[in-house]
Amino acid sequence: MKSAEIREAFLSFFEEKGHTRVASSSLIPANDPTLLFTNAGMNQFKDCFLGLEKRAYTRATTSQKCVRAGGKHNDLENVGYTARHHTFFEMLGNFSFGDYFKRDAIHYAWEFLTSDKWLNLPKEKLWVTVYATDDEAYEIWNKEIGVPAERMIRIGDNKGAPYASDNFWAMGDTGPCGPCTEIFFDHGEHIWGGPPGSPEEDGDRYIEIWNNVFMQFNRTADGVLHPLPAPSVDTGMGLERISAVLQHVNSNYEIDLFQNLLAASAKAIGCANEGQASLKVVADHIRSCSFLIADGVTPSNEGRGYVLRRIVRRACRHGNKLGAKGSFFYQIVAALVAEMGEAFPELKQQQAHIERVLKTEEEQFAKTLEQGLKILEQDLAGLQGSVIPGDIVFKLYDTYGFPVDLTADIARERELSVDEEGFEREMEAQRERARSASAFGMDYNALVKVDADTRFLGYEGTSGSGKIIALFKAGAAVDSLAEGEEGVVVLDQTPFYAESGGQIGDCGYLESAGMRFDVRDTTKAGGAFLHHGVVAKGGLSVGTSVKAEAEASVRQATALNHSATHLLHAALRQVLGDHVQQKGSLVDSQRLRFDFSHFEAIKPEQLKQLEDIVNAEIRKNSEVETEETDIETAKAKGAMALFGEKYGDQVRVLSMGGDFSVELCGGTHVSRTGDIGLFKITSEGGVAAGVRRIEAVTGAAALAWLNAAEEQLKEAASLVKGSRDNVLDKLSALIERNRQLEKELEQLKAKAASAAGNDLAGSAVDLKGTKVLAARLDGLDGKALLALVDQLKNKLGSGVILLGGVFDEKVVLVAGVTQDLTAKLKAGDLMRQAAAAVGGKGGGRPDMAQGGGVDAGKLDEALALAATFVEQGL
C-alpha cells in the first residue's frame, strides 16, 4: 500500500467506528505557550482531555502533521543519519474523550492492523508491551485478542522514578496520566536488535508502530494517583513507520513518499541518488520547511522563525556538500506538492509563496556560507584538541548566520564536537546585553484573577446595565473603591468591548446614584471583562447595579477601522496571493495598522490597486452579515481564521460583500460597508523578516488626510508659482534647472580648483629630496579635494600631498602620493594618522586616500603630520 492509501484507510476505519474525522491542526499550536510546534496528534485536543473544552463529538480521528526540531523534542541532529528520525512526520491517531476505553481501543488497533480488509499484517510479527501493573490491558491482549505471553512484555518504571516509564504517560508532574500499551513489529532475524526491554532494544529489528495511551488517573502534587471520572484514550501511529512495514523496507527513507522526494532532490542538486545521508537530510527538510511556511512561519532570528532558518540552512549546506550550484532547495517543493498536496491542500495553495521564501532564504545564506566556512577552516587549523570552543561557534552564529547544529554537523564530519555549554554562555551574555538595553512593562491583567464570566452586550449598542461582581485595587480583590481611587471593575454584563483581536478596549463611564467611575480602558482576563479606571465621584462596592455607557463616537470610529481591516485583508490576498496571512493588527478610533506575511515591499501600483478594491467594496454599501455557527461549518464556508488563535466550537462569522471577505471575528463592526466612507493607505513598510505593515485611515480621518494633502499640494503650487493642474510640470522644470545649475557650479569649482592648484604647487617644500604639500582649503567637499589632489600630483611630478578643510561643519581630508613613492610612502597610512588627529577615521589606496573627522580645531595639527610622515618614512 502507498502512504496515501494507508492514511485514508486509517481515517476511514475509525469513521466506520463512529469517530469524527478532524482536520490536522496548524503546526503553530493554538494558545499553547508550552509548545514550539505541534508534535503530537493530541495537541489540538489538550483542553478536551483536561475537561476545559467540550466538543460536539466524543470520538475523533486525525492525520496530524508534526514537527520535532528545536525545544524539548528536537530530532534535527539525527535526521539523515538514522532510519527513522525526521523533522516532519504524520501522526495517525484515534481519540476518545470519556467514551470508550482500553477494551475498545485495543480491539480497534488489532482489527485495523491484522484484518484482511485493512492492513492484514501477520499476527505472529506483532509484539505488545504494557505497563507492569496494568493487568487489565494485559488480560485484554492475552485472553481476548489472543497474543501469546511470549510476545507480551511488561515494562516497569525504567526511568529512575515512580511512574517514570516508557509505558506510562503523563502530561506533566501533576494532572492527567496513565499507562500505555505499545505495539511493535518484528522485521525479522536478518536485522539486529532485541525486543523492547532487552539490552538490544535499540536495534532496528523490533520497531514500535502504535502507542495507545490510557488516561485514567489524575496525579496530585503528593504523587498519588486518583481515578478520573471519565477516562480517555489518546493513540498515535507514525505514518512513515507503518508505511515502511507495509512496503517491506527497513528505513523510512525507502518508502514511496521519500523515494520521490529523494529523486527530486538529486535532480535539483545535480547528483546521483545513492542513499547519501546528505540527500536524506534535504528530502526530509523540504517537508518541514514547506509545511512550516504554509502555516505562516517565516525565517527570522528568533522563536519559530529561527528554527525554520536553521532547517533551511542545514538543507542548503548538505546540498552544497553534494555539489549543488546556486539555489536548488526551492525547486523540490513541486515534488512535495505532487506527493502530499491532495491530503494537505494548503501546500497547493501556498506553493508559489513557499518557493519564493525558500529561494530568498537560500540566496541570503549563500552570501555568508562561503565566507563563514573559510573562517571556520582557519579556526580549525589552529585547534588544539577535538572540541570546537563555544566562542568560535558563537562567532559563526552571530556574524555568519551559522546555526549551532550546522557547525555541529561540520564538526561531526571531522570527528570533532562543539562546546555547546560555551556557546550557551555566549548566547546568555548577548541576551543579558539585550535585556539591559530594554525596558519591560507589567501586565496588570496577570495580577487580576476572576473566576467569573462577563456577558457582552456591545453588539446591540453602547449602553447597558450590569451588576458589579468583583473589584480590584493594585491587583488585589477588594469590596469597595472610594472617590479618587484607581481600580478595576468587573460586571456580570457590559456593553464595553474588551481589547482583543487587535481592537482596543472601550472607554466611557459606569454610573449609579451619586457615583461615577470613569472607564479608561477595557481588557479581558479569561471570560471576565475588566473595566480599568478611576472613581470620579462617590464610591462603589461589590453587588451594586450600575448603568454602563461606552463612548459611542469612539466605538463607531473604531468600528470603521476594524471593518476596513477585513476588506484590506481580502484585497491583499487578491492582489498579492493566498500566502498573505494576518500577523497582527491594531485598530483604534484614529487609524488602523495591519501586519501580514509577504516577502517584499509592495509596489506603488499595487498599493493603488488595494485602495481601489477596498473603496469599491465600500461604495457597494453591502450589508455586513454576522452568523453564529460551529467552527467546522465556518471553515467549510471559507471563513479565515487567525493562525495561533484558539476558537471554541461556536464562532462568530463576519461576511462583507457576500463572499468577498469571510472571517472569524468577535469585534465590533459597521452595519454596511458604506458606513466606512473612505479608505486611504498612509504608509507601507517592513517590520520583521517576511512581515509587512500597512497603516491606513478611514471615514472622517481619511477625508482629513486627503484635505491636508490637498493643502500641501496648493502650497507647493504656490511656491513654484503654478496651479494644482501644472504643479508637476513646474516642479520638473525646477528640478531640471537645479540640475543645470549644479553642473555649472561643478565646472566653476573645477576652474577654481585648477587656479588654486597652480598657486598651491608653488608652495610645496622639499624634504629629503621629496616635495611635500599640505594645505587647508575650507569650503570644498571631498569630491573637489580629490580632483585637486589629482591635479597637484600631475603638477608636482613626484611628491606627497595632504589637503584638508571644513565642509558642512565636518573635517574633510584627502591624501595623495605619486606612484614613484608608494613603495615607501602610502597615502592610506598618512590618512589614518591625519584622520585620527581630528577624531575620525580614514584610509584608501597607496596612491590616494580619503578621511575625515569632527574636531576642526585640530585640523592644522593634522596637516602638519604630512612633513613628519615623510621624514619618518624615508
From Swiss-Prot:
Pfam family, one: tRNA_SAD
Binding site for Zn(2+): 562, 566, 665, 669
Gene Ontology MF: a single term: ATP binding
Recorded catalytic activity of this chain's protein: tRNA(Ala) + L-alanine + ATP = L-alanyl-tRNA(Ala) + AMP + diphosphate
Domain remark in the UniProt entry: Consists of three domains; the N-terminal catalytic domain, the editing domain and the C-terminal C-Ala domain. The editing domain removes incorrectly charged amino acids, while the C-Ala domain, along with tRNA(Ala), serves as a bridge to cooperatively bring together the editing and aminoacylation centers thus stimulating deacylation of misacylated tRNAs.
Family the entry assigns: Belongs to the class-II aminoacyl-tRNA synthetase family.
Name under which the protein is recorded: Alanine--tRNA ligase
Organism placement in taxonomy: Bacteria, Pseudomonadati, Pseudomonadota, Gammaproteobacteria, Pseudomonadales
